[in-house]
């Protein structure tokens, strides 16, 4: 029974675990546009971002990284990313995280297709980022108990993401309904204005023709 339960938990964790690992190139420009990645993070979660980049000092490029959220908070800002970097921070409220990179040519460097930095990014959040081995030792938990706690945390993350998406959908729906109402009111106002204008034009022309004795 214990083996079956543990196997089921491992299967569940395999389904719930999402590997956030990306490899990409960022070309160096004199006036570069930000290259951004976006990820939802639930409230009260630990976030760990690991970077590994190519390049070296004096290669004519300066790669910078900034991590912000949809509430306007800045969680990390690194002006010269070289080699391996690791950033860890806590997120108090549910938000969309933006991880943005800029690769800028240093003064005097010539822009070319060979001027670029290759980046390997690993992004872990919540249950992925928590150290359950340390938690297991600190609380004298059985391996299956640690797996259960991890599965529970994953489920809470998924619930948080669903609630966030539902709230965002409701907000968009309310915005659409408000916009539709405004468009409808504007259409009514336009129709009434045109109707009044037509009546006024008819009365004006009637008065004009009467003054010219063209109609009785």
From Swiss-Prot:
The record's subcellular locations are:
Endoplasmic reticulum membrane; Golgi apparatus membrane
Pfam families attached to this UniProt entry:
EMP24_GP25L
User: Transmembrane stretches, by residue range?
Assistant: 185-205
Name of this protein: Endoplasmic reticulum vesicle protein 25
- Signal sequence bounds: 1-21
Keywords associated with the record: Endoplasmic reticulum, ER-Golgi transport, Golgi apparatus, Membrane, Protein transport, Signal, Transmembrane, Transmembrane helix, Transport
The residue ranges for the Cytoplasmic side of the membrane come to: 206-216
Q: Write down the SMART domains for this protein, in alphabetical order.
A: EMP24_GP25L
The gene for this chain is: erv25
Q: Which family does it belong to?
A: Belongs to the EMP24/GP25L family.
A Gene Ontology term for the protein's cellular component: Golgi apparatus
One GO BP annotation here?
endoplasmic reticulum to Golgi vesicle-mediated transport
Task: Kindly give the PANTHER family that the UniProt entry links to this protein.
Answer: TRANSMEMBRANE EMP24 DOMAIN-CONTAINING PROTEIN
Where, in residue ranges, is this chain on the Lumenal side? 22-184
What is the role of the protein in this entry?
A: Constituent of COPII-coated endoplasmic reticulum-derived transport vesicles. Required for efficient transport of a subset of secretory proteins to the Golgi. Facilitates retrograde transport from the Golgi to the endoplasmic reticulum.
The UniProt entry lists membrane topology as:
Single-pass type I membrane protein
**Which residues are in the GOLD domain?**
34-150
Q: Which InterPro entries match?
A: Emp24-like, GOLD_dom
